[in-house]
Each structure stands twice: as C-alpha cells, then as structure tokens.
Amino acid sequence: MNKTITALAIMMASFAANASVLPETPVPFKSGTGAIDNDTVYIGLGSAGTAWYKLDTQAKDKKWTALAAFPGGPRDQATSAFIDGNLYVFGGIGKNREGLTQVFNDVHKYNPKTNSWVKLMSHAPMGMAGHVTFVHNGKAYVTGGVNQNIFNGYFEDLNEAGKDSTAVDKINAYYFDKKAEDYFFNKFLLSFDPSTQQWSYAGESPWYGTAGAAVVNKGDKTWLINGEAKPGLRTDAVFELDFTGNNLKWNKLAPVSSPDGVAGGFAGISNDSLIFAGGAGFKGSRENYQHGKNYAHEGLKKSYSTDIHLWHNGKWDKSGELSQGRAYGVSLPWNNSLLIIGGETAGGKAVTDSVLISVKDNKVTVQN
C-alpha cells in the first residue's frame, strides 16, 4: 500500500493495492547487514545465522537466492560494503572458539563471481560492533561502536556468573551504572584500503562516539544520525562528515528524535532529501540520566518509532510515519529511495518484509 504525507503536515493516508516492494526474506531478518551492487541486494548474518542471500531487483521473477555460508560463524551487528565488485564484511558480535560472546575486529571478503568467502589477514585496531561503515573514494570508513575490552569483559563476567541471578544482577548494575564517557565508545574514524588490506587513522570526532547510529552518504558528505551514547541511553545528535577539499570537517546538525533519540534507525536520500526513519529507544532515559541516574533505562520499556523525518531548511521535520515501529534492519539506496529490509518490531520480533521511502517535492511516499 502507499501512504503519502506532506513534509509540513501529516495528511490522511490513501491506500491502494500494490505489489510488495521485495519478496519476503527467507527468514525473519534483524541485526544483520546488507549491501547493494548493480541493483543486486545482498543480506546476511544477524537472525539469519551464517546465511547470506542475494536478490536481483531488476529480475522479472524476483526471488532470494542462497549464497555460500559465512565462514566466521553467526554474528550480529556486522557491517558490509561493496568495493570494486567484492563484498567486505567488518566485525560483529558472535561466539569465539571457547563459546564466549565477543566483539570481532576481523574482515571477510566475498567474491560474487566465485560465490566464495575468504578471511583477510587484516584486523582493525579496535573492535567493530555497533559501528557504521561507508565507502568514499574506493576505501571503506568505519567509526563508532562499543569498546571491545569493556564489552568482552561484560560477557566474560556473565559467563562466570552462570545461572547465579544475584551475581548477574550485580554485574548488570555495575555495567550500566556509569557515565557515558566511561564506556569509551569509538570516536575515531578509520579507513580500510582493500588494495593493501591496511587500516589507517583518518580522523576523530570532536564530540563523542556512538553505537547503533544510522549512516548515509552522498558525494563528499556522510551523516551519522542518533545511536547510543552509552548502553541503554540514546542520543538525538546528528553529525556530518564533510570530505570536501583536503581536510575532513566534522559538523553537528540540529538534533532529531528529541529528547531521547533512538538507535538502529534507518537513513537514506531521495531526490536530495535526507531521510531518517524508525529506530528504538527508551522514553524517559535522557531525563533520568540528566538527573544523575546513570542506569538511565532501568525499568523502562523499549519503544519503536514510526516517525519519518526529513532534513529541510536547516531543521528536521516530521514528515510521515511507518506502518509500524521498526529498528535494526538494513537500509540501502535503491531507485532514488530509501530501502529498508527486515528489522524488528515491538517485543524484538524479527520481520520479513521491506519498506521503500521516497520523497518528491517534500512529500513522503511509503510503500510496503
């Protein structure tokens, strides 16, 4: 169905029969990753385990095709990008050989021509989970994400506690009851050159690192929207990275999803309009934190946003709504629109459908 809403006011929705954007994913899909290359969509990991699938969006009979399984084990929160015809997968959260949950800093490459994976002899200088990845001038850039040592230590402690609920409660209280700066989320910008498989320092945010931000780039500009400032506490901040000229500039734009912000939202561009949609967060957590409660989301219920915002004339306007709140899916550029694949809804339920958000003359169209 189609729902059209002006950028200035939410109008009555008009519904019409329409074909689905894409066929349903082979499995309910959330916390995975995806990329698009020459109109072919690739998705995998997350709730799909080690599975990967592709779909030719230009095919008359659109269907998902299974690819070679990912060799690095099941992972959540990995990122991926296409460079020169190859798919690169960065980090994620999964089990190590001892069965402990950990953050990875490795890189895998998939060759679509041979349907084969290889683990590269390359490791990022820090863990990659909750990070974002984008491509600029033939290189992959990574920023944001949790601190590998702190995160891994948390899960080591939980493993030691086992089924001792008292010990688990104590570990959680200790883990969440700290200020945002004490989690050392990554604020460095790293670049990965696929030709050399080397990582380099590319800059750092003058503010703070986030985890679970939405990312979108066009030309020399990249936007990082919302995300976690610490576990359980989101931010409404929007950062712009400007690669114009020889010097990278970091800018801070007007906030969105205020006051609490969201993580796991979706970002894209349609007809030069910057879009931000969905995401999940804890209403009231920002107020709790500002009043000195570091465990800001304790006792709060996670909520899922239906809001669609457009960046217009230097500010964000709520310009439409999703049919249901959604977060932690894959967002990709397709047909001059924002394509959302999968995600989770209330209660953490993984979904199989896709959503296409388009903008024309400041009007938002949502196709399910």
UniProtKB/Swiss-Prot annotation:
<dbReference type="Pfam" id="PF24996">
    <property type="entry name" value="NANM"/>
</dbReference>
<feature type="repeat" description="Kelch 4">
    <location>
        <begin position="174"/>
        <end position="219"/>
    </location>
</feature>
<feature type="repeat" description="Kelch 2">
    <location>
        <begin position="86"/>
        <end position="137"/>
    </location>
</feature>
<dbReference type="InterPro" id="IPR056734">
    <property type="entry name" value="NANM"/>
</dbReference>
<dbReference type="GO" id="GO:0016857">
    <property type="term" value="F:racemase and epimerase activity, acting on carbohydrates and derivatives"/>
</dbReference>
<keyword id="KW-0413">Isomerase</keyword>
<keyword id="KW-0574">Periplasm</keyword>
<dbReference type="GO" id="GO:0042597">
    <property type="term" value="C:periplasmic space"/>
</dbReference>
<protein>
    <recommendedName>
        <fullName>N-acetylneuraminate epimerase</fullName>
        <ecNumber>5.1.3.24</ecNumber>
    </recommendedName>
</protein>
<feature type="repeat" description="Kelch 6">
    <location>
        <begin position="287"/>
        <end position="336"/>
    </location>
</feature>
<feature type="repeat" description="Kelch 5">
    <location>
        <begin position="222"/>
        <end position="265"/>
    </location>
</feature>
<dbReference type="InterPro" id="IPR019936">
    <property type="entry name" value="NanM_proteobact"/>
</dbReference>
<feature type="repeat" description="Kelch 3">
    <location>
        <begin position="139"/>
        <end position="173"/>
    </location>
</feature>
<keyword id="KW-0732">Signal</keyword>
<keyword id="KW-0880">Kelch repeat</keyword>
<keyword id="KW-0677">Repeat</keyword>
<feature type="repeat" description="Kelch 7">
    <location>
        <begin position="338"/>
        <end position="367"/>
    </location>
</feature>
<feature type="repeat" description="Kelch 1">
    <location>
        <begin position="40"/>
        <end position="84"/>
    </location>
</feature>
<keyword id="KW-0119">Carbohydrate metabolism</keyword>
<feature type="signal peptide">
    <location>
        <begin position="1"/>
        <end position="19"/>
    </location>
</feature>
<feature type="active site" description="Proton acceptor">
    <location>
        <position position="228"/>
    </location>
</feature>
<comment type="subunit">
    <text>Homodimer.</text>
</comment>
<comment type="function">
    <text>Converts alpha-N-acetylneuranimic acid (Neu5Ac) to the beta-anomer, accelerating the equilibrium between the alpha- and beta-anomers. Probably facilitates sialidase-negative bacteria to compete successfully for limited amounts of extracellular Neu5Ac, which is likely taken up in the beta-anomer. In addition, the rapid removal of sialic acid from solution might be advantageous to the bacterium to damp down host responses.</text>
</comment>
<comment type="similarity">
    <text>Belongs to the NanM family.</text>
</comment>
<dbReference type="InterPro" id="IPR015915">
    <property type="entry name" value="Kelch-typ_b-propeller"/>
</dbReference>
